[in-house]
């Protein structure tokens, strides 16, 4: 009986691996057929569209930000686009983060001290422990430091300040507010206000939006007609003028 159970387990694993290999083969074939580097692919989208949305993988993933920083590091981004927006970060901290990213510091330690001081108040979560935020901001600072063309970062999440929160009840009231309950439209509203004020580059406004996969979808939320961020942007700025790029997704809870 134990042998039979073992054999069934081996067969199940083999079939699972075969299915995964089939899926992987499809991806490899597609990449070979397209024959275009990921960064060039995104810049090609910007040729005919003004807004490109990147559907971020799980917030804990760091490898995706290697790609994103390589994209921002490309001279074409600062010269032709110049603006990047993120889901993470309260909108009222936008001025502070750009001061951080364009500042001059005597040493790396001085920058890191300023970075961690800023991060303590960037978000409405008591602790945002995702290292890729440090990775992203530090990388963007290095890009700006080494280029005369600066990249501007826009933060799109709910307006929030820890200085205004004195009790648990006050925090709960914020967490239950419409702005938090309908974050997708909140983030879109904040984006649209900042986007309208962007300086023109080559006669146009271009923007890269980085938001988590569920928000980036061109769809409504299940069981409702409430738009996700991607769908809102497409309806606001035109289907062809907004392109959505989804990074491959992993269900961490099942791995």
How should each PLM-predicted stretch be described?
Residues 1-23:
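Bacterial Sec-dependent N-terminal signal peptides
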Residues 18-255:
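Structured catalytic-domain cores with a bias toward divalent-metal coordination
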């Amino acid at each position: 009986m134990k042998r039979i159970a073992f054999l069934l387990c081996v067969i199940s694993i083999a079939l699972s691996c075969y299915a995964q290999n089939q899926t992987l083969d499809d991806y490899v074939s597609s990449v070979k057929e397209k024959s275009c580097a990921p960064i060039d692919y995104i810049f090609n989208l910007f040729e005919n569209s003004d807004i490109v949305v990147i559907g971020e993988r799980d917030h804990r993933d760091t490898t995706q930000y290697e790609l994103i920083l390589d994209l921002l590091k490309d001279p074409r981004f600062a010269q032709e686009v110049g603006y990047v927006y993120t889901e993470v970060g309260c909108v009222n901290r936008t001025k502070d983060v750009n001061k951080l990213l364009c500042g001059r510091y005597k040493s790396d330690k001085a920058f890191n001290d300023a970075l961690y001081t800023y991060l303590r108040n960037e978000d409405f979560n008591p602790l945002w422990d995702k290292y890729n935020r440090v990775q992203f901001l530090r990388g963007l600072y290095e890009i700006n430091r080494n280029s005369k063309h600066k990249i501007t970062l826009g933060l799109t999440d709910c307006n929030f300040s820890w200085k205004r929160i004195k009790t648990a009840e006050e925090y709960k009231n914020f967490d239950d507010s419409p702005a938090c309950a309908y974050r997708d439209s909140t983030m879109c509203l904040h984006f649209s206000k900042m986007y309208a004020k962007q300086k023109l580059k080559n006669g146009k406004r271009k923007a890269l939006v980085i938001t988590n996969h569920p928000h980036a979808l061109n769809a409504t939320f299940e069981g409702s007609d409430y738009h996700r961020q991607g769908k809102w942007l497409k309806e606001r700025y035109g289907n062809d003028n907004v392109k959505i790029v989804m990074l491959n997704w992993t269900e961490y809870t099942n791995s």
